[in-house]
Structures are given as C-alpha cells and as structure tokens.
C-alpha cells in the first residue's frame, strides 16, 4: 500500500500536531521505518489533572452527626467544685507568707491543680476556666470583677476566698457548656 506525497504530507502534519502534548500527560509513540518510509504509526494520549487543594481539604474534614442536645444531661456540680477549691487553696496557702515571686508561681500551680481535679470529675461538654488571684493582706481593699456572656440555664461558676495572716486568695472556676 503506497501513499501519495499529499497523503504523506498530511500524515506528517498530523504527527507534528500530536507531538505538542503537555508535560503533565502520559504519551507514547511507536514508529517503524522500513527503507526510509513510515510503515505504521500509533499514538496514545492520556491526561491526568493535578489534585487541587480544595479536593484535599474536602477529604480531610470529618462530619459529625448532630446530637440535637440543647442542654447538659448532668448539671455542673457547684458544691463538689467548692470543696475542691477549698481543699486545694487551703492546702497550698495555709502556712505561706506573702512573697511576690512565690505567689506568682503559686497562682499558676494552684490553677493547674484545680483544673486537673475538676476535669477528673468528667463532666462532659463543659469548658473550664480557672482564675486564681493572690495578694498581700495589708489593710487595703481590692475589687475584682469578671464579665462573661453565657446561658444562665447551663453555665455557672464556683468561687472560694481564703485569708491567712499575710495574704488573701480568690479562686474562681467558670464552667461554660459547649452546645
């Protein structure tokens, strides 16, 4: 089977067009030449898209089922937390004298211990905020205030005030229900 010069030109022109394939694609080309003439040629082109960031993000997110629970099944145990506050603050500060550096460190330590003991109660879906203030007891007055936006049906707090001969301490635990 002989090809005319015109048909050879069209085949060569068609082959040149197929040669411009993007570097992202996979292509193969086979050609057999016998005595300088093209005997058979075949070309396949496949294309693969690059994965986009949007595809990766949609695969990584985990959808959780709605619980349709609007309030806590078990309310925050304020009385139990009051006992924890009293025990921890009293045990740490009963015999201490006021020293600024020591009290600065004690506020951090006491708040971490209180938070750990309240978390051990395993009350689900409550966010805990623990704040401890320690100051020198020297015939001065102090006003400590806190403000928060919360639901009075489910959110609550617990507070304890401690005094000895040289210092005072105020420990607060705020419990905010996560819906």
Swiss-Prot record:
Q: What happens upon changing residue 49 to D?
A: May act as disease modifier for Duchenne muscular dystrophy being associated with earlier loss of ambulation
> What Pfam families does the record tag this protein with?
Tctex-1
Biological process terms from the Gene Ontology for this record are: microtubule-based movement
User: GO cellular component terms?
Assistant: cytoplasm; cytoplasmic dynein complex
Question: Which Gene3D superfamilies does the protein's record reference?
Answer: Tctex-1
The molecular function GO annotations come to: dynein intermediate chain binding
InterPro entries linked: Tctex-1-like (IPR005334), Tctex-1-like_sf (IPR038586)
UniProt record similarity statement: Belongs to the dynein light chain Tctex-type family.
Q: Which PANTHER family match?
A: DYNEIN LIGHT CHAIN TCTEX-TYPE 5 (PTHR21255:SF64), T-COMPLEX-ASSOCIATED-TESTIS-EXPRESSED 1/ DYNEIN LIGHT CHAIN (PTHR21255)
Q: What do we know about how this protein assembles, alone or with others? A: Interacts with ZMYND10.
Q: Name the chain's protein.
A: Dynein light chain Tctex-type 5
The species this protein belongs to is Homo sapiens (Human)
């Amino acid at each position: 089977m002989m090809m005319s010069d015109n048909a050879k030109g069209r085949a060569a022109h068609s082959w040149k067009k197929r040669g411009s394939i993007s570097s992202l694609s996979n292509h193969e080309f086979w050609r057999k030449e016998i005595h300088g003439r093209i005997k058979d040629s075949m070309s396949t082109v496949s294309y693969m898209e690059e994965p986009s960031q949007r595809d990766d993000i949609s695969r990584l997110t985990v959808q959780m089922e709605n619980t349709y629970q609007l309030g806590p099944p078990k309310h925050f145990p304020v009385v139990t937390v009051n006992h924890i506050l009293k025990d921890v603050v009293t045990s740490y500060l009963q015999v201490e004298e006021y020293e600024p550096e020591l009290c600065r460190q004690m506020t951090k330590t006491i708040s971490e211990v209180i938070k750990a003991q309240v978390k051990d109660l395993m009350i689900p879906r409550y966010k805990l905020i623990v704040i401890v203030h320690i100051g020198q007891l020297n015939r001065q007055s102090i006003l400590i205030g806190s403000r928060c936006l919360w639901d009075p049906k489910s959110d609550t707090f617990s507070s304890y005030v401690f005094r000895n001969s040289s210092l005072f301490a105020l420990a607060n635990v705020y419990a905010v229900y996560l819906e």
